[in-house]
Amino acid sequence: MIPRLSLALMMLGTATLHAQITPAEYAARRDSLSARIGDGVVIAFGGRTPITDFGPFYQLPAFRYLTGYEYADAALVMVVRGGRGSPTLFVHRSTPRRSLYYGAEPDSGALARDLRLPSRTAAELPAAMDSLARTGLPIYHLADFEAADFAAQDSLTRGRVFVRDLAARHPGLTVRDAHPIVNQLRARKSDAELALIRKATEISVEGHMELMRRAEPGMHEYDLQAIIEYAFRRGGAERPAYGSIIGSGPRASQLHYMKDRGPLNPGEVVVIDAAAEFGGYATDITRTLPVNGTYSREQRALYQVVRDGQAAAERNSRPGLSIQAALDSSIDVRARGLASLGLIESATATFDPPWPADCTRTPRSCQQVSLWAIHGITHGLGLEVHDPIQAYFGDRTFQKGDAFVIEPGLYITTRQLDILPDTPKNRAFKARVRAAVDRYQNTGIRIEDVYLITERGLEWISRAPREIDEIEAMFRSRTRAIP
């Protein structure tokens, strides 16, 4: 008997889901990019072979989006004239020594057949780009400007240096960043992409439920990390979609805490922000759990405020609705909830900031709610865990093909009060809320779920328990052994 995987899934195989993004879809993406560029030369760099610690290879997302090529040290060059592109993939040829280290890689015939892309050797790339630079066409780069691999000496995998050197050899060459165009294309997810996000989310939900069944006082954060990441791999994920954040007690209020070393103490909550990647597509789920299986009165109250804020955003996340309406509705609900708990003076009360200019950033910059609600509540999902969504562009509304999260949080810690300047207004505020802050001190609550905008409207797909009673029921059914 195969645990937790249906026979039907095993018969279909993981490769079937990966293959849902067809060569024709990759070609259509390149065609869309070509149409927007008109005339120019696109050069997109893939990720490099890890050479320092022999870690896992990660393909750069823009390159993967346009090619589907999953091997290292490659580049796509596409000559675009009149809105029509002619692509070529530059790849390292497999050698016996390279195969010994990294396994066999496809030959040019296999690439042409499987990806519908003609190929040349990576060694030919500099000369090819020099020739194209002399045509006078502008260069549109998708280089690894934000990747942490600048120490590599190979100019192919070090895209930033390659583009810089190309421009230096050809004075007057026009160089443009193609990322804004590609990001806008990536924002609308195809049915095949949504299927991969669904699968990544399904695996992640099972991981969270496995963790709920096994977490108990006396464990450490790394025990929970091991349980959930094991469940991800067992479910078919390539890896976690990002560094797992497992923070209990005071660490629950550290947004990107990743040490995952602390103990799980009775009476505390633990934030579990962890999810899987499948077929190159990421998802993102967070739950906040009671270590001993039951929320305290204060934890329940604060948790419900966060959950209500999430529900408000859900009601305002529909095709054609403004992303700002979702954000505003969530913060309004949380502000009223915080006021009812005595953690702020009123839903619209303000404070004096450390620097007066802080109040001009957003209409809510100096509202007291922003001391405890300290981050945004949505981002896209896709080839990156923070992927673009269509609401980032144009009229800023949700549209069919969006994949995104809603992740409100509240984090109560006295350090937020300590950063306020000593003014009469702030002294009065702190005096009024100090007792409540002490009661809720070191309580961090975040709930994060995954949603799709489809022809049916909003669809919630990360269906791990999230209501208080559901979570406590899961803890009552927990077991100990890991299968």
What are these regions (language model features)?
Residues 18-483:
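Active-site neighborhoods and metal-handling regions in enzymes and metal-associated proteins
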Residues 1-5, 327:
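Positively charged n-region of N-terminal signal peptides that target proteins for export
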Residues 1, 14, 25-26:
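General helical secondary-structure elements
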Residues 4-16:
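Bacterial N-terminal signal peptides
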